[in-house]
Swiss-Prot record:
It is found in: Secreted; Nematocyst. It comes from Anthopleura sp. (strain 'Zhanjiang'). Pfam families: Toxin_4. One of its GO terms (molecular function) is sodium channel regulator activity. The keyword Disulfide bond applies. GO terms for biological process: regulation of signal transduction. This is Delta-actitoxin-Aspp1d.
Amino acid sequence: GVPCLCDSDGPSVRGNTLSGTLWLFGCPSGWHNCKAHGPTIGWCCKK
């Protein structure tokens, strides 16, 4: 999957670890949305 920035990773992509994974159709079972304001497309989720 495509990595994405969770709220817990920090305010910006630069210099931070992207611990989330981008899912187009919502987070799969056992995952949770880790970004309060999601990306333009899809959801940023992590296990």
